[in-house]
Amino acid sequence: MAMLSNLMISHPEVQSFEDLERLVIEVAKSGEIFLEMDLKPDYPDTPRTWIARLESSFYRAEHIDRMNQ
């Protein structure tokens, strides 16, 4: 299980919500099947719908990756 806080700590190069969304997609494609939203991202561009956006990105990336196998 990937925890959002661990992803953010492990990747200090992530400086925006958009960067974080790309990282979440990479994590899903690497084989993670769960993503825990344990911390709200504190980036200036974090939308109010941040949970839905990250969940959607994670699920779509995982689903598309499985279809391509």
How does the language model describe each region?
Residues M1-Q69:
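Metal-dependent phosphodiesterase/phospholipase catalytic core, i.e.
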